């Protein structure tokens, strides 16, 4: 039979609701709330999310102002407590006081958080600059599609200009920071010993070329002689009677500006008795002009790509040869030196020979070094009063302005030529320093620079001339921060080291991946083809002397 159980009724005479709290709900904190409150985030670990004070209480409860569930991180857990959050009316002074106190606390908290993560605390102006930098960086990445760190090309190890064999012994090692401190002032005035060759006159119409009146670069078939020191008949003749150190201007310029070089290069040194001969190896890339060698990100394409370092060097050399002849008044009157070109045979057509003159000069470096150098001029120019000035003509070429932080020459060359030469100085510092050293050694009055660009960025066979610029070598050396005293100091240091070596053949090699040059001793038989030719020449000279 069903039975009715009488429930327990709790009487609350002073109010409504139960008089006692059930056991399962005892000691549970309670915060009044409203179902109309906006829901905030479940968890926010980023700290101060809202910089603007207007949005600080965006998601806070509007019904109950309590913070019973708030967590305060301290050293122990005694901070879990119920606090009285009843709001009291504050005076205007108190409100301002609390506002400033909260701002100071918030600033101190941000400073502690930044110090915890080793972040730099910036002043207000620096913060604005930092935000502007980040904004521009994001804009640049959006426009040009800069790769992220995980997709960036790593710097590949560069190859040496010549393979170092196991039987080569290191005799000396010089690092660039040490060489950059060298200074030498005891350099005498140069003395001209012999001048050979003929020069064509510069066509001043090329000074009026602009980006709007660009001129196509023509392919000019002329012979350029790149004869090394020991193969020069004039130097062989002079070595019998005078001088104890012999070299060409290109070899000396490589040594004098070596601290700017990045790629590997090598120079052969022969110690014969008390004489030194600085040579270049046959069939080497010594005479090729590097492109963007000193840029932050030099070209790294491989294989047959027309933007590979070697193909760019061949393209630059081709451009330099053609421009140095096209800007002259070819086939017309020439300026002739007393002696003919020593490398031209009698049956050769004079118009097929490039306009180059050779000036053999002598310097005294102290009391013990008698230096003889073969220097070159590329052309001659007449002034307003008819005076003759010798010039060196070189070419800067644009291959792709999107690489190596370049600037578009067609847009900037006429209006902002300073920005163009500054970018070239950054990307081709070593090449410009070599050209300047060659002009200083030769005593040229001017250094002519031509600006040549590809007709199309994807076509490395056609080029256009966009303009020219003229510098005095001494002023240009100061402009590119080339110290002549340091250049002579490096050369004197290298000569002194080689003079201390025993008789034989040595190799000066720039390390491909470090700022170091080393002097190797070469065993007998190294570069045997060169040695055989030299022995044959010595035998022929001895036979001629016996006959006379």
Curated annotation (Swiss-Prot):
Keyword Mitochondrion: no
Region feature Disordered, mapped onto this chain: 523-548
Keywords: Acetylation, Cytoplasm, Host-virus interaction, Initiation factor, Phosphoprotein, Protein biosynthesis, RNA-binding
Modified residues (Phosphoserine): 161, 528-529
Biological process, per Gene Ontology: cap-dependent translational initiation; formation of cytoplasmic translation initiation complex; IRES-dependent viral translational initiation; translational initiation; viral translational termination-reinitiation
Effect of residue 249 to Q: Reduced binding to JUN mRNA
GO cellular component: cytosol; eukaryotic 43S preinitiation complex; eukaryotic 48S preinitiation complex; eukaryotic translation initiation factor 3 complex; eukaryotic translation initiation factor 3 complex, eIF3m; membrane; synapse
Chain intervals with Acidic residues compositional bias: 529-548
Main location: cytoplasm
Residues annotated with N6-acetyllysine modification: 53
Disease as annotated in the protein's UniProt record: Defects in EIF3D are associated with some cancers, such as prostate, breast and colon cancers. Disease susceptibility may be associated with variants affecting the gene represented in this entry. Down-regulation inhibits proliferation of cancers.
Subunit structure, interactors included: Component of the eukaryotic translation initiation factor 3 (eIF-3) complex, which is composed of 13 subunits: EIF3A, EIF3B, EIF3C, EIF3D, EIF3E, EIF3F, EIF3G, EIF3H, EIF3I, EIF3J, EIF3K, EIF3L and EIF3M. The eIF-3 complex appears to include 3 stable modules: module A is composed of EIF3A, EIF3B, EIF3G and EIF3I; module B is composed of EIF3F, EIF3H, and EIF3M; and module C is composed of EIF3C, EIF3D, EIF3E, EIF3K and EIF3L. EIF3C of module C binds EIF3B of module A and EIF3H of module B, thereby linking the three modules. EIF3J is a labile subunit that binds to the eIF-3 complex via EIF3B.
Domains: entry comment: The RNA gate region regulates mRNA cap recognition to prevent promiscuous mRNA-binding before assembly of EIF3D into the full eukaryotic translation initiation factor 3 (eIF-3) complex.
Function: mRNA cap-binding component of the eukaryotic translation initiation factor 3 (eIF-3) complex, a complex required for several steps in the initiation of protein synthesis of a specialized repertoire of mRNAs. The eIF-3 complex associates with the 40S ribosome and facilitates the recruitment of eIF-1, eIF-1A, eIF-2:GTP:methionyl-tRNAi and eIF-5 to form the 43S pre-initiation complex (43S PIC). The eIF-3 complex stimulates mRNA recruitment to the 43S PIC and scanning of the mRNA for AUG recognition. (Microbial infection) In case of FCV infection, plays a role in the ribosomal termination-reinitiation event leading to the translation of VP2.
Protein family (similarity comment): Belongs to the eIF-3 subunit D family.
The protein, known as: Eukaryotic translation initiation factor 3 subunit D
Taxonomic path: Eukaryota, Metazoa, Chordata, Craniata, Vertebrata
């Amino acid at each position: 039979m069903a039975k009715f159980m009488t429930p327990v009724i709790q009487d609350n005479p002073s109010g409504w609701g139960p008089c006692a709290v059930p056991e399962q709900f005892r000691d549970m904190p309670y915060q009044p709330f409203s179902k109309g409150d906006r829901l905030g985030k479940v968890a926010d670990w980023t700290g101060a999310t809202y910089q603007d004070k207007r949005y600080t209480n965006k998601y806070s409860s509007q019904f109950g102002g309590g913070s019973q569930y708030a967590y305060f991180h301290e050293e122990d857990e005694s901070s879990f407590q119920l606090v009285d959050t009843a709001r009291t009316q504050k005076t205007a002074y108190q409100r301002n006081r609390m506002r400033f106190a909260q701002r100071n606390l918030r600033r101190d908290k941000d400073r502690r958080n930044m110090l915890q993560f080793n972040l730099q605390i910036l002043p207000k102006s620096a913060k604005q600059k930092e935000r502007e930098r980040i904004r521009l960086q994001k804009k640049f990445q959006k426009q040009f599609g800069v790769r992220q760190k995980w997709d960036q090309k790593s710097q590949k190890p560069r190859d040496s200009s010549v393979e170092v064999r196991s039987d080569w012994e290191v005799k000396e090692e010089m690092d660039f920071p040490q060489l950059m401190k060298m200074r030498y002032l005891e350099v005498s005035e140069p003395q001209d010993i012999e001048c050979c060759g003929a020069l064509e006159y510069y066509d001043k119409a090329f000074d009026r070329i602009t980006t709007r009146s660009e001129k196509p670069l023509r392919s000019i078939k002329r012979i350029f002689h790149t004869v090394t020191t020991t193969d020069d008949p004039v130097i062989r003749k002079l070595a019998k009677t005078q001088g104890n150190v012999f070299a060409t201007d290109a070899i000396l310029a490589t040594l004098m500006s070596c601290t700017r070089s990045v790629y590997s290069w090598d120079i052969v040194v022969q110690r014969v008795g008390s004489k030194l001969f600085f040579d270049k190896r046959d069939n080497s890339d010594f005479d090729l002009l590097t492109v963007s060698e000193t840029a932050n990100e030099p070209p790294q394409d491989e294989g047959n790509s027309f933007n590979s370092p070697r193909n760019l060097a061949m393209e630059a050399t081709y451009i330099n040869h053609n421009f140095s002849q096209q800007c002259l008044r070819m086939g017309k009157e020439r300026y002739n030196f007393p002696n003919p070109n020593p490398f031209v045979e009698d049956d050769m057509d004079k118009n097929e020979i490039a306009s180059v003159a050779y000036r053999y000069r002598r310097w005294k470096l102290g009391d013990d070094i008698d230096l003889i150098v073969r220097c070159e001029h590329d052309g001659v120019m007449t002034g307003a009063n008819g005076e003759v000035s010798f010039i060196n003509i070189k070419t800067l070429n644009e291959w792709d302005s999107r690489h190596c932080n370049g600037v578009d020459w067609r847009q900037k060359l006429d209006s902002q030529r300073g920005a163009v030469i500054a970018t070239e100085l950054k990307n081709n510092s070593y090449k410009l320093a070599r050209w300047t050293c060659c002009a200083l050694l030769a005593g040229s009055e001017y250094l002519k620079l031509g600006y040549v660009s590809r007709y199309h960025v994807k076509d490395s066979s056609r080029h256009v001339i966009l303009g020219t610029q003229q510098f005095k070598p001494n002023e240009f050396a100061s402009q590119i921060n080339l110290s002549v005293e340091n250049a002579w100091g490096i050369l004197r240091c290298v000569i002194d080291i080689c003079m201390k070596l025993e008789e034989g053949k040595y190799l000066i090699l720039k390390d491909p991946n470090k700022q170091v040059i080393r002097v190797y001793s070469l065993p007998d038989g190294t570069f045997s083809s060169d040695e055989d030719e030299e022995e044959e020449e010595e035998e022929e000279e001895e036979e001629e002397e016996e006959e006379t």
